[in-house]
Amino acid sequence: YDPGNSAVAKSNARVIEAHLRHTPPVDLLVTSETNGDEFAKLLGLHHHSFDPDRTQVPVSSTQIREDLISNWHLLGPGSRELLAIRAVFIGAESTGTTTTTLAVQSELMKRQGNFATTNWIREYGRDLTMRKKEQAEAMGLSEYAVPWTTNDFVEIAIVQQQLEDVAARTGGPVVCCDTDVFATIIWERRYLGEKAALPMPGDSQNRIYFVTQPDGVPFVQDKIRDSEELRISMTREFEDD
């Protein structure tokens, strides 16, 4: 809102009104601004002035936009979820994705300030893999006797996204993700082939991908991984998509 430019003020009011048409009825505008009364009139709302001296909330929205990182702790959970950068580490098995993700989290936390609460998201698919393996062992079967299904990957995608969103709402400006929904889709293709059903997610401006490489990284078999030879082809899958 620019009180010195009536055309801009009216244009901003029209944008807000357009958004309000998709929400429950609103009749009150709460601001800490000296021009709150005037802007409320443009919107046809009542105005309530809250903390105009900024003693309870010592910052303005302009200041937050100018330095988002320093003011991160003042954002609400919903704003954090929308604005947090998702640093996503993906790659074939035994290429160091978890090690790298944890190392980046550690380095960010050393910066202190709002980075001290940097969250790390574990790979839920690994949890489910262990459960399926234990299920097979309990029945006296080979671990391959309990096949992967579409429902398994739907569960992984849903839970992985939930874990990520909770971490964004409660942590610092960057969320360190040891995989995400996109990687889940690549693994679904690997195990289900033409039966894979998960759709590719849309583009996200706050998501940065890092693909870990097998070069020089020894393959460590932890009893749930595929073969070492598969690492090369899976790495290409991640890079190509």
PLM ranges: what are they?
Residues 87-106:
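Glycine-rich phosphate-binding P-loop
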Residues 87-91, 134-152, 182-187, 221-226:
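Surface-exposed cleft-lining segments at the edges of enzyme active sites
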Residues 1, 123-125, 178-181, 211-216:
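Short loop/turn segments at strand-loop or loop-helix junctions that form parts
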Residues 1-86:
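Nucleotidyltransferase catalytic core that binds NTPs
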Residues 152-204, 213, 220:
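Glycine-rich phosphate-binding loop used to anchor ATP phosphates in small-molecule kinases
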Residues 64, 192-241:
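A glycine- and Lys/Arg-enriched "phosphate-lid" helix/loop adjacent to the NTP-binding pocket
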Residues 106-162:
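Conserved substrate/cofactor phosphate-moiety recognition/catalytic segment
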